[in-house]
Amino acid sequence: MTQFTEEEKTIRRIERRFNKGVVQYGLIEEGDKILIGLSGGKDSLALVELLGRRARIYKPRFSVVAVHVVMKNIPYQSDTEYLKAHCEAYGVPFVQYETAFDPATDTRKSPCFLCSWNRRKALFTVAKEHGCNKIALGHHMDDILETLLMNITYQGAFSTMPPRLMMKKFDMTIIRPMCLVHEADLVELAALRHYQKQVKNCPYESQSSRSDMKGILRQLEAMNPEARYSLWGSMTNVQEDLLPDKID
């Protein structure tokens, strides 16, 4: 019987869940050209590794390119030379794109929302410039479940970030290939790979409600170790006849 090291077990577990998500949600098709959003955090670094390796080994055949968006007026900084070297290690071309936004233009929305939206627009621009038909983002299962809880709590909506989303306005498909990967495994991978941390973190990070939802997800898993799978399953098990039905 083959004995695997702890590192090998972690990598095999991540790749198994990654490949399952890609296949289960039909995220990659023959001839795709996929732009990877590379922020510089552990999740996007892992995504470069996983997609770069899959592009060389598995069918259907597809190609990838990674972009790091620099928001010039936000003191959030990554070592771009490190990011470029990381991409080269997995055969992924690297692009850097600079942009900026003014948080004062819309005080009704948080700086995080405005920054995220402007980064997203930059991704669409670069994707079109490089002939890409899909954009891959590094959201994992925890991100998706936390967003589900946030939307229920703050928006009164049963919605989240889906593994695959067609953005008709931009004629572009957003994919999240790590949708079934657990954040704990990515933390372990980052330690095993010695991923370099960002030079400076975003000053608005602490204003996010996401850390609160991380705590709630941990509490749910303390009550029920299978809670994350129950939450995930609930998104495709909506029993409408057992929900309130308004009479117009």
What does each model-identified segment do?
Residues 27, 206, 221-225, 240:
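Alpha-helix boundary/capping and short turn/kink residues
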Residues 17, 21, 216-219, 234:
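Residues that form generic nucleotide/phosphate-binding pockets
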Residues 134, 142-222:
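Catalytic subdomain that performs nucleotidyl-dependent activation
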Residues 2-146, 154, 184-192, 242:
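ATP-dependent adenylation/nucleotidyltransferase module used to activate substrates
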Residues 13, 118, 181, 208, ...:
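Conserved active-site and cofactor/substrate-binding residues in soluble primary-metabolism enzymes
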